Amino acid sequence: MLVHIPEVLSRDQVRHCRELMARADWVDGRITAGHQSAQVKRNLQLPEGTPEARELSELVHGALSRHPLFMSAALPKTIFPPLFNRYDADGEMNFGSHVDNAIRTVPGTGVRVRTDVSSTLFLSDPDEYDGGELVVEDTYGSHAAKLPAGDMVVYPGTSLHHVTKVTRGSRIASFFWTQSLIADVTRRAMMFDLDMSIIRLNADHPDHPSVLSLTGLYHNLLRQWAEV
């Protein structure tokens, strides 16, 4: 299940992020890759723990907690502190097919996060670069995402995915993982579909008695399936 989440960041917030990144020093992105991923990863990354990275991470984390569509799609229990990467054309940068590590440890804390949901928040507009599509594979085929700056795509952490080679410009993004209250991807997708159906029904028929009964069903399923 891929979900496009629009306007996670405003244009002003994106501009602020880009200004911070312009002052920062970038390093080889393989510093956060697992053994398998490091063999196919060619990009740059902001080092964790720098003042710029901390401010950017806090900005993105705050925006996520205020976005109802992300909360519905991911049902977050723990969000790994957002990271930031860049793919440049002059380095022929790309990220070959891989699956994200199942468990991530938050640096300096010992807190472990199960990567149920993967997210990419675009910080470059599509016309700023060629290539650089995020391609996610599932049982229904391949799905490519190349979204406006400030928009985000979320998808199951179990998915095989890759980033195509950037041939012009630079692709800048934030990426992170979420441990969901519901680990099972099928149950999580069902809850998202149910929540969206309730929202649409309430918008069209706010006094319909099914709004209340379906809302009760949603919370009872969450009570049964959630890990807290």
UniProtKB/Swiss-Prot annotation:
The keyword Glycoprotein does not apply. This is PKHD-type hydroxylase RPE_4577. Fe cation binds at residues 98, 100, 161. 2-oxoglutarate binds at residue 171. One of its GO terms (biological process) is DNA damage response. InterPro entries: Oxoglu/Fe-dep_dioxygenase_dom, PKHD_C, PKHD_hydroxylase, Pro_4_hyd_alph, Pro_4_hyd_alph_FE2OG_OXY. Its EC number is 1.14.11.-. Disulfide bonds: none annotated. It comes from the Bacteria. GO terms for molecular function: 2-oxoglutarate-dependent dioxygenase activity; iron ion binding; L-ascorbic acid binding.
